[in-house]
Amino acid sequence: MRSSSPSQPPSIKKAHRQAKRRAIRRRRIDLQCGCSIYFHIDCTGHGFTHRGIHHCTSGGEWRVYLGDSKSPVFQDIQSRGPAIHQNEDIPCTNTVQPQPEESVASPQSLPELPSLDDFDDSFWVNLFK
């Protein structure tokens, strides 16, 4: 009885050529700041941070880029600045975090160590005997 499978396996080169011609499947994300970002379809479930705001692929901001006249291009966005403080009830504080001043004293975790000049000469003589 004849085998149903061919004696030679099909060439992978044909599949590679077709894959190169195929368009890259990606989604377009239109953010509130006016920026548009594209990400690969297989990258769902991953988040990213843009201008200090974290975005997740499960949110409602994701839209499929369809192209031509159906493209979700939003031209009504006036501001391209980051919208970090949207609630006016919350005062906008200084974004620079103050750093503690440096001091010449020992850190709290280390006890005060004596100066090497305070040791007697006999200490050094006995140390190096």
From Swiss-Prot:
Domain of life of the native organism: Viruses
Region annotation (Transactivation) ranges: 115-129
Keywords in alphabetical order: Activator, DNA-binding, Host cytoplasm, Host nucleus, Host-virus interaction, Inhibition of host innate immune response by virus, Metal-binding, Phosphoprotein, Suppressor of RNA silencing, Viral immunoevasion, Zinc, Zinc-finger
Region ranges (Disordered): 1-21, 84-114
PTM: Phosphorylated.
GO biological process: symbiont-mediated suppression of host innate immune response
Segments forming unnamed zinc fingers: 33-50
Subcellular location(s) per record: Host nucleus; Host cytoplasm
Single GO MF annotation: structural molecule activity
Example of a GO cellular component annotation carried by this entry: viral capsid
Biased amino acid composition, Low complexity: 1-12
Pfam families: Gemini_AL2
Sequence similarity: Belongs to the geminiviridae transcriptional activator protein family.
Record remark: domains: The zinc finger and the transactivation region are involved in PTGS suppression.
Entry function: Strong activator of the late viral genes promoters. Enhances the expression of the capsid protein and nuclear shuttle protein. Acts as a suppressor of RNA-mediated gene silencing, also known as post-transcriptional gene silencing (PTGS), a mechanism of plant viral defense that limits the accumulation of viral RNAs. Suppresses the host RNA silencing by inhibiting adenosine kinase 2 (ADK2), a kinase involved in a general methylation pathway.
Name of the protein in question: Transcriptional activator protein
Species for this entry: Abutilon mosaic virus (isolate West India)
